[in-house]
Amino acid sequence: MLYGRIFFNSGVQLLSMADKKFSLIALVSFTALAIIVLYHNISPYLTPSDLIAQGKAENVQVVGKIVSVNGNTFQLSDGKNTITAVYNGTVQRYDAEVVVVGNWDGKVLHATKVLQKCHTEYKGG
């Protein structure tokens, strides 16, 4: 029986050389595209020291401690280095561990999200 370009002969599938090449090219292209998309969506946690060493970066996640707040600007530290971050929202409190998501222009972190880490700890009893 004939179904498109694939022939069935006693349950055995026969593909032409052109079909095999097309299938291989399609598979390799899809795999490469998936790897590229995953690579660009993965955003590892950085410290302020890592960020300073890296230079400009987009869509970064920076973990650190808020050491001071002044309006919509705050200072984020990892104990070694401190960076300035700007956020158009409310920072709940300083002296808190946070993850800041945003874009780094080399001098200021322009935050799109500020996520406070949970400060409570499980204590088994």
UniProtKB/Swiss-Prot annotation:
Main location as per UniProt: membrane
Membrane protein topology class: Single-pass membrane protein
BP-aspect Gene Ontology terms: cytochrome complex assembly
Transmembrane regions: 21-43
One term of GO molecular function: heme binding
Keywords (A to Z) from UniProt: Membrane, Transmembrane, Transmembrane helix
GO cellular component, one term: plasma membrane
Leader peptide range in chain numbering: none
Compartments in which it is found: Membrane
Protein's UniProt name: Uncharacterized protein AF_2191
Organism this protein belongs to: Archaeoglobus fulgidus (strain ATCC 49558 / DSM 4304 / JCM 9628 / NBRC 100126 / VC-16)
Lineage: Archaea, Methanobacteriati, Methanobacteriota, Archaeoglobi, Archaeoglobales
